[in-house]
A protein has these predicted regions:
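A short, structured active-site edge motif that brings together acidic residues
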Residues: 1-11, 37-40, 98-103
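Hydrophobic/aromatic pocket-lining and membrane-interface residues
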Residues: 3, 26, 34
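Active-site mouth loops of central-metabolism enzymes
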Residues: 6-17, 42-49
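Short, acidic/polar
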Residues: 15-30, 78-84
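Generic alpha-helical secondary-structure signal
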Residues: 18, 22, 37, 187-188, ...
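Active-site groove signature of glycoside hydrolases
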Residues: 29-46
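Beta/alpha (TIM)-barrel catalytic core signal, keyed to glycine-rich beta->alpha loops juxtaposed to Asp/Glu
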Residues: 42-244
């Protein structure tokens, strides 16, 4: 098990010591078990020098003897290449990149560019929101129970109709393979060599997700999902902080 955290580059966290306090607080909360520290988002769009100082800060902490690896999140291919080179000058290898990646993710073309760079540089590609906030788990032929959250209810209602064909395909494959819709959607991520980060709140969800690794999508199943995904024009919202 690897423990990872994300440190946010808030405006007041600047310079080569901006992450010292939140890093030490995280380390304390996690009982000194912290394997990966990620920059939560790129500041390239509005304050590019800030993230360089904060990454220098993480490199300094490693030089001081703290044992962890550095990761990035919500970053585009151009900025990723620059930061890989930046870290290399500090003799540091980037461990991971965390990106929104699912059948409903926006800008999948850009995500695939990031994935290619990760593969070429032996960087782990972490796929967050692989179930698109649970939308891909909704049974296309049944009315789901109302969620406790008003925001989630509104989200589900807005996406039910536009994603119907995609969810129907997920259900068909799930039925043929005797698995859940969630497993199919997650397996789509695994098929492409990513590491999906799945949010789980219930024991039943943990058990279900653990079974993802007992089977693999077939090539024809993957292709069908790809085709239907492309036809689905209602994608998840873009992360406003994601860089180019």
């Amino acid at each position: 098990i690897q423990v990872a955290t994300k440190l946010a580059p808030y405006p007041w966290r600047i310079g080569n010591r901006g992450f010292n306090k939140p890093f030490l607080k995280s380390l304390e909360r996690l009982n000194n078990k912290l394997d990966i520290v990620q920059l939560h988002w790129s500041t390239a769009k509005y304050n590019p020098w800030q993230e360089l100082g904060l990454l220098n800060n993480l490199c300094d902490l490693k030089d001081e003897g703290f044992d962890f690896e550095i990761g990035l999140s919500n970053i585009g291919p151009k900025r990723l290449m620059k930061l890989i080179k930046f870290l290399a000058k500090r003799d540091q290898h980037l461990k991971s990149v965390q990106i929104q990646f699912s059948l409903l993710a926006p800008d999948l073309g850009k995500q695939y560019q990031v994935k290619k760079i990760c593969d070429e540089n032996k960087i782990d590609f972490l796929a967050y929101s692989p179930l698109s906030f649970g939308i891909l788990c909704i049974d296309p032929d049944k009315e789901e129970n109302k969620e406790k959250s008003f925001i989630r209810n509104s989200l589900f209602e807005n996406y039910k109709k536009p994603t119907y064909e995609l969810r129907r395909c997920l259900k068909r494959i799930a039925h043929q393979r005797s698995v859940s819709q969630a497993q199919v959607a997650i397996n789509w991520c695994c098929y492409q060599g990513t590491i999906p980060l799945v949010g789980m709140r219930k024991k039943s969800q943990v058990i279900d997700v653990s079974n993802v690794f007992n089977w693999n999508l077939k090539k024809n199943e993957f292709k069908v999902l790809q085709e239907i995904s492309k036809k689905c024009f209602k994608k998840m919202p873009k992360n406003p902080f994601s860089s180019n």
